[in-house]
Amino acid sequence: MLVMPAVGTVMNVVLSGLFTSLTITLSHQVIISILTALAAGILIATSVRVVAILNSIGVVLELLVLLGAAVGLLFHQHQSLSVLGSTASVQGHGSYLWPFLVVVALVVTQLVGFETAGAFAEETNKSRIKPSQAIIAGLAGTALVLFIFDLALLLAIPNVGKAMADPNMIPDVLTSALGSGFAKLFFAGAIVSVFSTAIATLATIVRMIYGMARNGQLPGSGFLTKLSPSTDEPLGTILVAVVLSILPLIFIKRIPVIVAAITALIIIPYILVFGALLVRRLQGWPRSAAQFSLGKWGLPITVAGLVWTVIILWDAAWPRTITNPHLGPLPVIEDLAIGCFVIGLIWWFASLRNKPDPQGAAAIDQPARE
C-alpha cells in the first residue's frame, strides 16, 4: 500500500514538467496523489483484462517516449563523454566507489514498476513460466533504455554546474534541446506511463491482499474475498487497498519523507524473499526439473541479489534531515519498520501461529503442471 503515494508523487513531478506555469503546492500534491489512487482503483474494479491492456499500453509507451527522447537528445550534445568523470567543481573526499554504489542503488527504484507490470503475465496459461520471462525482459529492456536516456540527457546539459542546482533540470534540458512542444509530448506520454504504473502497482497490492485473505491469513477474510457478481472482482479488497494507500498522504504531510520511507520499506520483502530462497538453495532446492530455471546461476544470482538489496536498504535508511528525520525516538523509517514488525508479530501470535500451511511445505518442490 505504501508504494501508491510514491507513484502519486511521481505523477506530481510529471505534471509540473508538462504545465511549467503551474505552481504545485503540498495540498495539490496530496490531492493529485489521492485522485491517482482512486482512479486506479475504479479501473481495477472493472476488469482485470482491461487493466492488463492499459498496463501493456503504458509500458510500451514509456519505453518509446524514453527512447525517442534519448535519440533526440543525442543530436544536441553539449558535453563530451569526459563529463561522466567530472565532479562539476564539487569537492570529493576519498573514493567515489560508495557514491557510485549509492546512485546505482537509487536507480533500482525506477525498475519496480516494470517488475510489477511483469506480474500480469500470471494471467496467461503458462503462469509458472511467463511471469519470470516477462519480468526479466521488462527489467532488461528498461535498464537498457534508461541507460541510453540518462546518458543522452547528461550529454545534452549546456551547463552541468547550473543544472545541478536546477530543480527542474530534466524539463529544462528537454525544452532547451528539443523545444517546448516535444518536451510537453514527452511528459504527456510520461503521464500515461506513470498512471499505468499506478494501476499495475495497485493491482498487485490487491492480488496480494486477496491471496492472503483467501488463505485465511488476514482479518476480515470473508469481506476481502467476496467477489462482485457483475465484474468478478474483489471490490472489498480493492476498497481496502485504495484507503490504505491514501492514509499516509493524509496523516504525513512531508511528501519526501513518505517517499523515502516507501523506498526503504518495499525493499524489506525482497530481502526476506532472497533470504528464504538462499536457505532453500543451500538445502538443495530445486530437487526436480522446472519449466523455468536459472540453472547453475541460481545460487550466485541469489547471493548477489541479497547483498545488493541490503546495500539499497542501508542507503535508504541512512539518517538524513530531509528524507529520514527524527519524528519520534528513532528516524522515521526505523520507526515505521519497527511498527510494521510489531503489528505483524502480534497478528502472527494471536491468529496465525497455529494455522496449518494452506498448501503444505512440500508444494514448493512440486513441478508445475500447465
Name each model-derived stretch.
Residues 8-36, 41, 77-100, 318-331:
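Inter-helical loop and helix-membrane interface segments of multi-pass membrane transporters/permeases
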Residues 28-79, 135-140, 259-272, 294-305, ...:
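Membrane-interface loop-to-helix entry segments
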Residues 22-28, 56-184:
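Helix-loop-helix junctions that connect adjacent transmembrane segments
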Residues 16-22, 90, 134-199, 218-258:
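TM-loop-TM module centered on a large, flexible mid-protein loop between adjacent transmembrane helices
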Residues 43-49, 181-182, 241-261, 282, ...:
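Transmembrane helix-loop junctions in multi-pass membrane proteins
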Residues 1-37, 41-45, 191-208, 254-264, ...:
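Hydrophobic transmembrane alpha-helices that form the core helical bundles
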Residues 237-246, 272, 298-316, 339-341:
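Hydrophobic membrane-spanning alpha-helices of multi-pass integral membrane proteins
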Residues 277-301, 319-370:
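Terminal cytosolic tails of multi-pass membrane transporters
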